[in-house]
Structure formats: C-alpha cells, structure tokens
Swiss-Prot record:
One of its GO terms (biological process) is regulation of TORC1 signaling. The basic repeat unit of a COPII coated vesicle is composed of 5 proteins: the small GTPase SAR1, the heterodimeric SEC23-SEC24 complex, and the heterotetrameric SEC13-SEC31 complex. This repeat unit polymerizes to induce membrane deformation into a transport vesicle. Component of the nuclear pore complex (NPC). NPC constitutes the exclusive means of nucleocytoplasmic transport. This is Protein transport protein SEC13. It comes from Saccharomyces cerevisiae (strain ATCC 204508 / S288c) (Baker's yeast). Keywords: Cytoplasmic vesicle, Endoplasmic reticulum, ER-Golgi transport, Membrane, mRNA transport, Nuclear pore complex, Nucleus, Protein transport, Repeat, Translocation, Transport, Vacuole, WD repeat. Functions as a component of the nuclear pore complex (NPC) and the COPII coat. It is one of 5 proteins constituting the COPII coat, which is involved in anterograde (ER to Golgi) double-membrane transport vesicle formation. First the small GTPase SAR1, activated by and binding to the integral ER membrane protein SEC12, exchanges GDP for GTP and recruits the heterodimer SEC23/24, which in turn recruits the heterotetramer SEC13-SEC31. The polymerization of COPII coat complexes then causes physically the deformation (budding) of the membrane, leading to the creation of a transport vesicle. WD repeats lie at residues 7-46, 51-92, 97-138, 143-195, 202-244, 252-291. Changing residue 262 to R: Growth inhibited above 30 degrees Celsius. Present with 21400 molecules/cell in log phase SD medium. Belongs to the WD repeat SEC13 family. It holds the Pfam family WD40. It is a peripheral membrane protein. GO terms for molecular function: structural molecule activity.
Length: 297
C-alpha cells in the first residue's frame, strides 16, 4: 500500500491508477490535479496540473492505445483533457457544454474509440467523441431533471467468435441522479443518440454513484449507492431480461455512501462513505453478498 500524505492543500476527491498501475492521478478541492509515479511502496510527484476554476471532482485515464491522456471534471462546469508527451503535461482540449458542476467523467471501453461520458448537475449527460482531426462531436441527453451525479459505461460485449463488439449499437451506460433513480441508456442508430432503455427504482434519496461491473458475462451487474445509506446490486440475466434488485445488506450503512468501484475482474465491490471506511464485498455461491474485508491505511 502506498500512503501519499500532504499531496493537496484541501480535500482529495479522487485517486486513480493508470492502466499499468505505474502512475497515480489525484484531484482536490484545491483546484489542482497531481500526477505521481508509483514504484512498489514509494511515490514521486511528477507534475501538478492547473486549469480548473473550482474543486476537481474526478479524473480518469484513457486507454494507453490513445496515448498518455487524462480527463478531469470540476465544479466549474468543464472537462479538461490533458496529455503527456516527452515528459511534459499540457492541456489539449476543453469540453464546456454544461451549465453547472460536472460530477463524473469516464472514458469508454477502448473498443469504442476515444469516447468520454460526462455527467452534470444541469441534468444532462454528454458523450463526447474525439476525432483524429482534433474536433469533438458531443451528444447531449436530458437524463435526470434535477441533476446527474454519476455515469458509468457498460463493458464492450463479446461476440460469438470471442471478439469484442465495438459497434455503436452495443454502447450502453448507466446514470444515477438526484431524482433517486438509476437509468440505463443505449445507443440508437436511427435516432443517432442514446435512448432510455430502463428506469430502476429502489433508492429513497439521491443516487451518489453508479458502477457497471467490467465482467463480460451473460449476466450484467450494476451497483448503485445513495444518500439513503444503502447499496443496491442490480442484475440482468440477458439483454432482453428484466433488472433484478438485491440490497447488498438488509440494514443501512452507518453513513451516506459516496462511491462504488468494482475490481478489474468484476468479482469484488469496494464501497466508501461518510464514515471514512472502504469496505469490500463479494457474492457467495448462494447469490448473497458478504463482507470481504476493509481497507485500512
């Protein structure tokens, strides 16, 4: 475990390792992003990225096939795209179509190309495609009228020949909103936008985070966490089937849950909340979810 102390002057909101686990990006209310080189249990600050005019909520690394690229989102309503070349970081693009805080940013599975999913308090989600000539082509969707707190891509599906399906029609994502709802969206070629496929009801307060498990199985798994102090696991046995709701545990958590994150293999779920703990959960053979440990500093 690497402990990075005194990295920022204010609260840290996100910390994400790159594809190879060698670089760590952190972001904070101090309006900065910091890039660290991580080696074993040691770390070294490489650069501090400035450009946002408000707290920076989240960061996400693009797949390395697109280069060393990072996206960040902020209370200032902007998404900034950063790139490292020859050891130097620079800002290469600004996505500024939202009129309120941008709360979530995530690159799509690389099979879909350089696509970015953005969620905002203005109630909208934007999907931004970065073209080779440097232009962008955003699709903007009215998702949750009183604000979108989080959005997460579904993994690229596997075809019968074992290859990943990178077609537009297979693109899906989930959103969580301040209307207490979880919504599933799918690309529609005729409409040339993402259309609502399912609305999932189960929370009694704001949905703070949603996470689609990266496992490419017949069954799809989603996790949603809420201000209501619950985590719901949603499962779908096949693409045409209904979504089934399972409370992760019957009793409520001690405090609001802020974040949910799946392991790369998709079999362990990490939750963090207002009690400053990170708890790990696994599904047992009976389909029940049980604690798999806590992460301690």
């Amino acid at each position: 475990m690497v402990v990075i102390a005194n990295a920022h002057n204010e609260l840290i909101h996100d910390a994400v390792l790159d594809y190879y686990g060698k670089r760590l990006a952190t972001c904070s209310s101090d309006k900065t992003i910091k890039i660290f080189e991580v080696e074993g249990e040691t770390h070294k600050l490489i650069d501090t990225l400035t450009g946002h005019e408000g707290p920076v909520w989240r960061v996400d690394w693009a797949h390395p096939k697109f280069g060393t690229i990072l996206a960040s989102c902020s209370y200032d309503g902007k998404v900034l795209i950063w790139k490292e070349e020859n050891g130097r970081w620079s800002q290469i693009a600004v996505h500024a179509v939202h009129s309120a805080s941008v709360n979530s940013v995530q690159w799509a599975p690389h099979e879909y190309g350089p696509l970015l999913l953005v969620a905002s308090s203005d109630g909208k989600v934007s999907v931004v495609e970065f073209k080779e000539n440097g232009t962008t082509s955003p699709i903007i969707i009215d998702a949750h009228a009183i604000g979108v707190n989080s959005a997460s891509w579904a993994p690229a599906t596997i075809e019968e020949d074992g290859e990943h399906n990178g077609t537009k029609e297979s693109r899906k994502f989930v959103t969580g909103g301040a209307d207490n709802l979880v919504k599933i969206w799918k690309y529609n070629s005729d409409a040339q936008t993402y259309v609502l496929e399912s609305t999932l009801e189960g929370h009694s307060d704001w949905v703070r985070d949603v996470a689609w498990s990266p496992t490419v199985l017949l069954r799809s798994y989603l996790a949603s966490v809420s201000q209501d102090r619950t985590c719901i696991i949603w499962t779908q046995d096949n693409e045409q089937g209904p979504w089934k709701k399972t409370l992760l545990k019957e009793e409520k958590f001690p405090d609001v849950l802020w974040r949910a994150s799946w392991s790369l293999s998709g079999n362990v779920l990490a939750l963090s909340g207002g009690d400053n703990k990170v708890t790990l959960w696994k599904e047992n053979l009976e389909g029940k979810w049980e604690p798999a440990g806590e992460v301690h500093q």
